[in-house]
Amino acid sequence: MVGPLSDRAIRRILKPLVFAASLSPVAFLIWDALTHQFNVNPFNAIVRSTGFWSLRFLCLTLAITPLRWLTGWHSVMKFRRMIGQFGFFYGTVHTAAYVLFDRLAGLDASVRARPLVATAHTLSAIGADLLRPFFAIGLVAFALMAPLAATSSVGMMRRLGGRRWQVLHRLVYPVAVASILHTYWPLTPRAPRYAVIIGMLFVLRLGRAYARRRASMARRVQATG
């Protein structure tokens, strides 16, 4: 069992440390760009790296509740929103990098000089990409992440009501599945490990839900007995 931490220690020490650690991938990307550590296609490296970091933070977000169950460390829940927001942040950077580097930067200079024409060409290219399942699934994952990030605050939880908020935030599981498929589709070697991690976390969730259901049924039997 992990002992409780004071709110002051979490707010002043641990949260800034977690925030800084969560931003470290950006610092490493900037460093690699400045020191020319990227391969022949640096833009592709940025797109891939931010995509994987979004998936990693998604895995961490899903792991927080099981970690609380297994360790009794309830204070860890205070970090879930921040980690989830970083998952959306890296997903946003991943999507923006794809649009800017893979699509907009690939246009002829004369086309880029005309904003409306460049926008039309870029949207046309994105529309063509969406006919490919790999891109379409990635867009679905990002679109589902947006309402989760927008409603992750305590204030939004109160506005929606606890039950509706919980139902909405179960979208994290379709997001996880879509993210794995988006990663796995191009046969990326690292994708299976994330599938295993998310699968194990999902099994833990199911086991916890089953145990709670049995406990609830047992209490009902005792109450009626």
Regions found by a protein language model. Give the residues of each.
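Membrane-embedded alpha-helical bundles that constitute the cytochrome b-like, heme-associated redox core
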Residues: 1-225
